[in-house]
């Protein structure tokens, strides 16, 4: 590679050959002295990623070369360009806040002329200021999407942090009090009110509202631990839930940490936090920024980033620091736990922990719940408030049965324990083991006590088993049809219950009430099937009578089409079980004429990349990516495969057809289709998907995979249509429609498709179309900027999470982030801890999976005029969503054709092809 500005001498840059005589001995860490400042090579050397293990050869024309020893692939930020760029970003952010503060000041003067005036307090006069409480009242009176005092306090804290608001005594924390006075710096602005100014004010308040929660969290962390309020402790605790350094800790420990964490900022890169050999006094978590880890002899070992931690080992082992920590960039923020607090928390955890042993081995570990950590109800008299941390599967089940009472409600902690167990039991207790254990408990009778006591014990125990089984059936529903062990167990249990009149009558009385009080959704998102009580209970619904809304759900026993291509692009379609293995697919192919043995099954994407499939791989038809196809070929032909023409995507766009349908109606059609896919996902599919098929072989995640494929399809659909629109004017109109489409999807609470469309608009092939973006009206560009805020990934997508928390169901969440959270929980926590099941991990996975149940707890109202609404209306009209297909948004394209179009989108997913088309549009 040759490097140089036009007119400069060219430098040839490449890996050095160690045995080359032209190089001589490499000079480790040396830089060539002959490289002038300002040349392109000088800039390359500043920004170039240089691994320690390689030397680089720099050949200047007619001059002797030199060698450079690299440090690591991560670029260091001590170059002037990087510092200038970072400072410019911070300066731009500050300018936006200052401008927002001036706009807010101007509007407050116009609406509340007496807000800012001279104040007298404790014999002191404060000129031209307002009290904290009055300022909060004034901003609340503006409306503009601000609904709570805490939200306004966050806005004011942002203004205070950036200097757009000042405390008369220079306090750094905003307080909503009458005796705290604040003033806006600078001259008093002219009170001008225009329609455009009101729009800018709304945009300013939205910006401040977005940054408000982060400012409040920083204030809470800056406070001394003893001065933090309960609300601030909850805020810190919520933040700790998304920090990977503490993901392995229990929630009770995280609450303890929230009370002792200290905020420690450092402003300058190169600051040494501590040195190797120092005494360990603190444990650090990186909240913002990054650090370099350096040791004697090895130099730079690694770089740690946001969410990583360091320093814990020295506290645990009471040993000196094993490395030196150096700030890698400016403005690094750390969360610090001092040694005495660290040791106290460890001791408190041990004091709250109870271990049960059998035959000299620990079989159950319980932790006493902290006061206020549980639901807001008084503890039940005589019942200890312990949480299962780990245990053997049998002991966890035994404790669950003992904890279940006949009078527990849906808000009882036992109900959550039951839900956690049922959602995750396949991870640690397969159905065969669970059924055997339940039958064992059903037959167990106590050895001592009177006959009446024994009879009461047996009756209560069997009631608990029936209740657990009924909830198990309610959760999994028809998924148990394909499990022979489960069906056999349910039949045996039905026979046993039929012999006991008390249990049969109790089952008939309790089941309808249980169904009304506690609805555990099945795979279709509707009410769970109830048992039909005749002479014997029928546990499972009749397969001949499918449940409402289940037509699109793929079950384990279903057969799906396997479209298999030959190298000549001829296609054979087989109907095979969705969980069929590659070996079974090849066996079915062997029975077809013209197919020979010795061939392999591979999947090929639109770029022509082929990946061989292992014989034991299952569900390959439903796990195919976007525009991927299955090919059966001889092994030597794999590298010669050419994608099927259908994989390459369209060559002509649909801009003319899309012009006939409004963005509102298009969003409604997309949302209706997404709901049909989203409702087909069972909660447990998230857990199965994260664990992988190698752990659970007799389950399918086809519904979840189909929904994820739809997400990818939508984002590439946006990029495809824009790249296939050759005329600048219509292309700008199409871009405008997609931005409005994203806004309507957000309004309809379809956040998954909203993110997909926004990701499509941010595709590099689209974002580079500068002339197209310039054609957009200013109002549309402002709308796009406002929508982009929800995509902010900082602090683990805090903006999105806060927005989601404010939405009431029905909601379609951003599924990739939910799966990321599930993967984070799975990979950050061991399933086994000291040979016991880590039930704390199961609890966290179940909590994440229940997000689907929460989002679908109210039925959506169809938004498309094509689909019937009568059968979908919810009983509670207050939660029904209003149709967006108003008279003002009627489209000239028929709803039927639009519905067919959104279900069969054709896209180009080859990024190289999209980039090529983009360059043709705007070179």
UniProtKB/Swiss-Prot annotation:
Changing residue 421 to A: Abolishes interaction with PDE3B. The keyword Nucleotide-binding applies. GO terms for biological process: adaptive immune response; adenylate cyclase-activating G protein-coupled receptor signaling pathway; angiogenesis; associative learning; cellular response to cAMP; establishment of endothelial barrier; intracellular signal transduction; negative regulation of syncytium formation by plasma membrane fusion. The keyword Signal does not apply. 3',5'-cyclic AMP binds at residues 311-314, 321-322. SMART domains: cNMP, DEP, RasGEF, RasGEFN. Residues 110-186 form the DEP domain. Gene3D superfamilies: 1.10.8.1240, Jelly Rolls, Phosphatidylinositol 3-kinase Catalytic Subunit, Chain A, domain 1, Ras guanine-nucleotide exchange factors catalytic domain, Son of sevenless (SoS) protein Chain: S domain 1, Winged helix-like DNA-binding domain superfamily/Winged helix DNA-binding domain. Widely expressed with highest levels in adult kidney, heart, thyroid and brain, and fetal kidney. Interacts with PDE3B and PIK3R6; form a signaling complex that regulates phosphatidylinositol 3-kinase gamma in angiogenesis. Guanine nucleotide exchange factor (GEF) for RAP1A and RAP2A small GTPases that is activated by binding cAMP. Through simultaneous binding of PDE3B to RAPGEF3 and PIK3R6 is assembled in a signaling complex in which it activates the PI3K gamma complex and which is involved in angiogenesis. Plays a role in the modulation of the cAMP-induced dynamic control of endothelial barrier function through a pathway that is independent on Rho-mediated signaling. Required for the actin rearrangement at cell-cell junctions, such as stress fibers and junctional actin. The DEP domain is involved in membrane localization independent from regulation by cAMP. This is Rap guanine nucleotide exchange factor 3. It comes from Homo sapiens. The gene is RAPGEF3.
């Amino acid at each position: 590679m040759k490097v140089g500005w036009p007119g400069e001498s060219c430098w040839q840059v490449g890996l050095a050959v160690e045995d080359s005589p032209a190089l001589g001995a490499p000079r480790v860490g040396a830089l060539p002295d002959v490289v002038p400042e300002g040349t392109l090579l000088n800039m390359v050397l500043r920004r170039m990623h240089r691994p320690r293990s390689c030397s680089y050869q720099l050949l200047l024309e007619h001059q002797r070369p030199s060698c450079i020893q690299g440090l690591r692939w991560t670029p260091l930020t001590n170059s002037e360009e990087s510092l200038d760029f970072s400072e410019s970003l911070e300066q731009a952010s500050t300018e936006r806040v200052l401008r927002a503060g001036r706009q807010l000041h101007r509007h407050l003067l116009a609406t509340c002329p007496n807000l800012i005036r001279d104040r007298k307090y404790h014999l002191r006069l404060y000129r031209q200021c307002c009290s904290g409480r009055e300022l909060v009242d004034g901003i609340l009176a503006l409306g503009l999407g601000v609904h709570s005092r805490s939200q306004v306090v966050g806005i004011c804290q942002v203004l205070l942090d950036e200097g757009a608001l000042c405390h008369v005594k220079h306090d750094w924390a905003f307080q909503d009090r009458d005796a705290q006075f604040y003033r806006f710096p600078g001259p008093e602005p002219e009170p001008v009110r225009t329609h455009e100014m009101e729009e800018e004010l709304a945009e300013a308040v939205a910006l401040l509202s977005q940054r408000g929660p982060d400012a409040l969290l920083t204030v809470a962390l800056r406070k001394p631990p003893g001065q933090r309020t309960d609300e601030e402790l909850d805020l810190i605790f919520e933040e700790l839930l998304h920090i990977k350094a503490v993901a392995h800790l229990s929630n009770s420990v995280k609450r303890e940490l929230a009370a002792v964490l200290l905020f420690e900022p450092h402003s300058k890169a190169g600051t040494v936090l501590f040195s190797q050999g120092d005494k360990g006094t603190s444990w650090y978590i990186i909240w913002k920024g990054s650090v370099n880890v350096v040791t004697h002899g090895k130099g730079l070992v690694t770089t740690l980033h946001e969410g990583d931690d360091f320093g814990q080992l020295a506290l645990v082992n009471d040993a000196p620091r094993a490395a030196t920590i150096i700030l890698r960039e400016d403005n690094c923020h750390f969360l610090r736990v001092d040694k005495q607090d660290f040791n106290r928390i460890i001791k408190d955890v041990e004091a709250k922990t109870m271990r049960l042993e059998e035959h000299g081995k620990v079989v159950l570990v319980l932790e006493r719940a902290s006061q206020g950590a549980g639901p807001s109800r008084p503890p039940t008299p005589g019942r200890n408030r312990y949480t299962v941390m780990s245990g053997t599967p049998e002991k966890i089940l035994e404790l669950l049965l003992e904890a279940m009472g006949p009078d527990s409600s849906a808000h009882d902690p036992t109900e959550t324990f039951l839900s956690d167990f049922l959602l995750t039991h396949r991870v640690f207790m397969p159905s065969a083991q669970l059924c055997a254990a339940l039958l064992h408990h059903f037959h167990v009778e106590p050895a001592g006590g009177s006959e009446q006591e024994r009879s009461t014990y047996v009756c209560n125990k069997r009631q608990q088993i029936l209740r657990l089984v009924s909830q198990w059936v309610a959760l999994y529903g028809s998924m148990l049809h394909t499990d022979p062990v489960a069906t056999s167990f349910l039949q045996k249990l039905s026979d046993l219950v039929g012999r006991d009149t008390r249990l049969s009558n109790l089952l008939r009385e309790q089941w309808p009430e249980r169904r009304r009080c506690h609805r555990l959704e099945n795979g279709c998102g509707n009410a769970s099937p109830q048992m039909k009580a005749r002479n014997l209970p029928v546990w499972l619904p009749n397969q001949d009578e499918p449940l409402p809304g289940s037509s699109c759900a793929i079950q384990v026993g279903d057969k799906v089409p396997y479209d298999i291509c030959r190298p000549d692009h001829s296609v054979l379609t087989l109907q095979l079980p969705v969980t069929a293995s590659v070996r079974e697919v090849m066996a079915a192919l062997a029975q077809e004429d013209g197919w020979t043995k010795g061939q392999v099954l591979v999947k090929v994407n639109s770029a022509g990349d082929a990946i061989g499939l292992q014989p034991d791989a299952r569900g390959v038809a439903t796990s195919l990516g976007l525009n991927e196809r299955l090919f059966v070929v001889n092994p030597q032909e794999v590298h010669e495969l050419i994608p099927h023409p259908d994989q390459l995507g369209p060559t002509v766009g649909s801009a003319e057809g899309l012009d006939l349908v409004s963005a509102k109606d298009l969003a409604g059609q997309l949302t209706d289709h997404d709901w049909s896919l989203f409702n087909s996902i069972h909660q447990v599919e998230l857990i199965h998907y994260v664990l992988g098929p190698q752990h659970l072989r007799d389950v399918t995640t086809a519904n979840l995979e189909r929904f994820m494929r739809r997400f990818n399809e939508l984002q590439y659909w946006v990029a495809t249509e824009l790249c296939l629109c050759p005329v600048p004017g219509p292309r700008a109109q199409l871009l405008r429609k997609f931005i409005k489409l994203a806004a309507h999807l957000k309004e309809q609470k379809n956040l998954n498709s909203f993110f997909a469309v926004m990701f499509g608009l941010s595709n590099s092939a689209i974002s580079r179309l500068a002339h197209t973006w310039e054609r957009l009206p200013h109002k549309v560009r402002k709308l796009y900027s406002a929508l982009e805020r929800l995509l902010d990934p900082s602090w683990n997508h805090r903006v999105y999470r806060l927005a989601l928390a404010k939405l009431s169901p029905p909601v379609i969440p951003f599924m990739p982030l939910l799966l990321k959270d599930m993967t984070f929980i799975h990979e950050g926590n061991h399933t086994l801890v000291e040979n016991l099941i880590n039930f704390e991990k199961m609890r966290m996975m179940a909590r994440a999976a229940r997000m689907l149940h929460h989002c679908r707890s109210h039925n959506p109202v169809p938004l498309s005029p094509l689909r019937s609404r009568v059968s979908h209306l919810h009983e509670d009209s207050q939660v029904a969503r209003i149709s967006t297909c108003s008279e003002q948004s009627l489209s000239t394209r028929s709803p039927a054709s639009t519905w067919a179009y959104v279900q069969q989108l054709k896209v180009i997913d080859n990024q190289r092809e999209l980039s090529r088309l983009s360059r043709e549009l705007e070179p």
